[in-house]
Amino acid sequence: MNRIKQTFAALAEQGRKGLIPFITAGDPDPAKTVEFMHALAAGGADVIELGVPFSDPMADGPVIQRSSERALARGVTLKSVLADVKRFRETDPKTPVVLMGYANPIERMGVDAFAAEAHAAGVDGVLVVDYPPEEAGVFAEKMRAAQIDPIFLLAPTSTDERIADVGKIASGYVYYVSLKGVTGAGNLDVSSIAGKIPAIKSRVPVPVGVGFGIRDAETARAVAEVSDAVVIGSRLVQLLESAAPEGAAAALKTFIAELRAALDGAGNTAR
């Protein structure tokens, strides 16, 4: 059983919900990425999503776009992100790490080479935003062969057929995008999310994490009531964008601890 599966199995046994924070590797300072990852874990993160910066992040809003631009300007690459994961693993062998990004950097490295290097670094899952599930069967097989979970997105516009396609190849968890549009946009409609989750869970045999639009403990708790996990990204990137460098890791840890407390107070209604 891999780290992601172990984590969600333990959460289910404890009646708790998963907390999955996202940060962009290398932003605002490449030398701080591993420290930030440890701060997230210490604050109570169950899984860490680490963004691989890309020059055309089409699914991301202005906040994460800016973070990608800053990281790229500082020389961050897919190889340097994998090196960060390897350094993180030296002192944290337990917290699952998922890389989130776009196909181009992986294809430039080569899918087979990426799978081997990601496995060696200690990556547990990969979410490629622009790999549609109906075209990702071979990619998913190669990831699983390297003991890496291929993770896919679903959205309010996903048809039953698309959900079923994802259910056939996803492992680890699926990421339900709670809003139409790009990351960091709009207001949450929890009742709409609650209406969609049963259709997903009836067709997808892995936990469902919900993200986009989650900004604080209140929205995290509300989403946790109807899902298996909460994903939060833009708010954390904003925090790092505005925090004083010397206090950024502590601010991350404090914010994640607040979300952790809120989620631990949420009911286990999604099971």
UniProtKB/Swiss-Prot annotation:
It catalyses: (1S,2R)-1-C-(indol-3-yl)glycerol 3-phosphate + L-serine = D-glyceraldehyde 3-phosphate + L-tryptophan + H2O. Pfam families: Trp_syntA. GO terms for molecular function: tryptophan synthase activity. It is an enzyme of class 4 (lyase). Its EC number is 4.2.1.20. Keywords: Amino-acid biosynthesis, Aromatic amino acid biosynthesis, Lyase, Tryptophan biosynthesis. The active site is at E49 (proton acceptor), D60 (proton acceptor). PROSITE patterns: TRP_SYNTHASE_ALPHA (PS00167). One of its GO terms (cellular component) is cytosol. InterPro entries: Aldolase_TIM (IPR013785), RibuloseP-bd_barrel (IPR011060), Trp_synthase_alpha_AS (IPR018204), Trp_synthase_suA (IPR002028). Pathway: Amino-acid biosynthesis; L-tryptophan biosynthesis; L-tryptophan from chorismate: step 5/5. The keyword Glycosyltransferase does not apply. Tetramer of two alpha and two beta chains. The alpha subunit is responsible for the aldol cleavage of indoleglycerol phosphate to indole and glyceraldehyde 3-phosphate. Belongs to the TrpA family. PANTHER family: TRYPTOPHAN SYNTHASE ALPHA CHAIN, CHLOROPLASTIC (PTHR43406:SF1), TRYPTOPHAN SYNTHASE, ALPHA CHAIN (PTHR43406). This is Tryptophan synthase alpha chain. The gene is trpA.
